[in-house]
């Protein structure tokens, strides 16, 4: 069934006009906004009594906290209007928490409802009351992810530490030895490619032969439409280096997820990320509708033989 479903998803294609129309009808789902805000908490904190039990604040204490939050928020708003930076304004108040959102997304709360309003202009500043809390919000810009995604191939030489005892005296020595071994293997693989045909196809053959990445070692190590932040930091930074050109190769090392050495081949740029996001959303919507249509008229019945099963 999964192959049948995937075949249907893969068959879905959309014209540029259809993608643009869907985007324009669902901008909030795809746009990102650059804004800052200061959060002023309008409720009092709970405390502990002598026995360590939690004591909730009284109505009077909460009312006082809200009054203080309102006063501080209004004062901060005025200070920012007069030219003080948001972060510095927040620092003037114990209950003011500053947040910078250079690529904020819409969530439907009071702040993002204001930020993502179509009428927003650069430099707009406001005070928002939401429940017991207050927010001073400064808007900078809004737009879609216009940068191009990238296509890359890679060969992973994984540093396997699953059988090592991190508390053992010789742990670091063994770890360093395994790192050195995998680094040497990565360098040897790149050298083999450089001494061969030096083509994308020859790199793909090596990936199928050598890569420890089970997610790509049957398709030549290929990842398409990679977006910023999708891969581990070192991999990401190499792929999105502004100087990167088709046919570039390199080796990066990362720790954590997929610890090891990545031999990378840069295939080239692909569709803008916003288009990738929109197409994926359209596919998800169409697949859901298709799947619902498949099962809506199905009625489950229990065969008589089921009663004999124990």
Regions found by a protein language model. Give the residues of each.
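PPIase-associated folding chaperone regions across multiple families
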Residues: 1-64, 106-184, 208, 228-310
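An amphipathic alpha-helix/helix-turn recognition signal
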Residues: 64, 68-71, 181, 202
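Peptidyl-prolyl cis-trans isomerase
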Residues: 71-112, 146-147, 188-233, 268
């Amino acid at each position: 069934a999964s192959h049948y479903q995937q075949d249907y998803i893969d068959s879905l294609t959309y014209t540029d006009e259809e993608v643009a129309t869907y985007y324009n009808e669902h901008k909030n789902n795809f746009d990102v906004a650059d804004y800052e805000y200061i959060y002023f908490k309008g409720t009092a904190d709970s405390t502990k009594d002598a026995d360590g039990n939690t004591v909730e604040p009284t109505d009077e204490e909460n009312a006082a906290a809200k009054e203080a939050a309102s006063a501080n928020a209004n004062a901060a708003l005025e200070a920012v209007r007069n030219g003080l930076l948001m972060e510095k304004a927040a620092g003037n108040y114990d209950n003011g928490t500053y947040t910078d959102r250079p690529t904020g997304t819409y969530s439907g709360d009071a702040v993002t409802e204001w930020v993502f309003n179509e009428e927003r202009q650069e430099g707009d500043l406001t005070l928002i009351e939401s429940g017991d809390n207050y927010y001073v919000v400064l808007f900078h810009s809004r737009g879609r992810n216009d940068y191009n995604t990238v296509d890359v191939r890679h060969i992973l030489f994984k540093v396997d530490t699953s059988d090592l005892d991190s508390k053992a005296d010789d742990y670091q020595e063994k770890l360093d030895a395994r790192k050195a071994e995998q680094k040497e293997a990565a360098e040897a693989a790149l050298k083999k490619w450089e001494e061969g045909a030096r083509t994308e196809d020859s790199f793909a053959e090596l990936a199928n032969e050598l890569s420890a990445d089970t997610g790509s070692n049957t398709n030549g190590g290929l990842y398409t439409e990679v977006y910023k932040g999708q891969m581990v930091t070192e991999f990401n930074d190499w792929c999105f280096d502004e100087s990167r050109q088709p046919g570039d190769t390199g080796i990066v090392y990362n720790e954590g997820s997929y610890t090891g050495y990545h031999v990378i081949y840069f295939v080239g740029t692909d569709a803008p990320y916003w288009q990738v996001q929109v197409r994926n959303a359209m596919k998800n919507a169409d697949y859901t509708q298709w799947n619902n249509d498949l099962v809506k008229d199905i009625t489950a019945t229990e065969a008589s033989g089921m009663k004999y099963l124990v």
